[in-house]
Design a protein with these regions (language model features):
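Mid-domain, small-residue-enriched loop/turn segments at the edges of structured enzyme/sensor domains
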Residues: 1-24
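A penicillin-recognizing enzyme superfamily signal
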Residues: 18-192
Length: 192
């Protein structure tokens, strides 16, 4: 919190997060209010044998923390109240049902929540999608900020990449919706 600017536009995304930070913060919602230690995929095998991709950087326990410059809490710690996590998770589920993340419906699963993002002038876009068993963030942009072009958004750039990845692994991901914590009451409100 100390490194975030104290400005009202922060809620609209005025502060740029790295993909790792984005995944770390969204993981709190995927884990019922608990913070987790994020990690990178460093190797992908085809048919269990041929290496399709191999991350060249050595992955060690504190490498991620050294890149980001701060410690991440261990899984046991609650960052936010589980009831708050559930409500935000429910809102993000709606974003994948009727909002900018609705392309997720092509997976024929109703347990994935997510959020698209687009910076000013479309210099970078992202999508973070998750259920309680997996969370993945895709960032799309240039190393040196430059516009991606007109009409480029998280839903048209990062989300399709995320979907392509998920289509390959979806059958191996267990269905997972957060259980409703005690202490929450659902009421239908209709002012029309």
């Amino acid at each position: 919190r100390d490194e975030l600017p104290n400005v009202l536009s922060l809620a609209l995304g005025s502060y740029g997060l790295s993909p790792l930070e984005n995944a770390s913060y969204f993981a709190v919602f995927a884990n019922g209010g608990r913070s987790i230690q994020p990690f990178f995929i460093n190797k992908i095998l085809k048919n269990g044998e041929e290496i399709e991709f191999l991350e060249k950087k050595e992955i060690v326990e504190n490498l991620i923390e050294s890149w980001v410059g701060k410690k991440f809490p261990k899984k046991e710690s609650f960052t936010i109240d589980p009831r708050v996590s559930y409500i935000i998770n429910d809102i993000l589920l709606e974003a994948t049902r009727r909002g900018t993340g609705k392309k997720i419906q092509s997976l024929n699963r109703d347990d994935f929540a997510g959020k698209t993002g687009t910076t000013n002038d479309a210099e970078s876009t992202w999508f973070t999608g998750f259920n309680k068993n997996i969370l993945t963030t895709v960032w799309f942009g240039y190393d040196q900020p430059a516009s991606l072009g007109n009409n480029e958004f998280g839903s048209s750039t990062a989300l399709p990449i995320w979907l392509n990845y998920m289509e390959e692994i979806i059958d191996d991901i267990e269905y997972g919706i957060q259980p409703r914590p005690s202490g929450l009451i659902a009421k239908k409100i209709n002012l029309i």
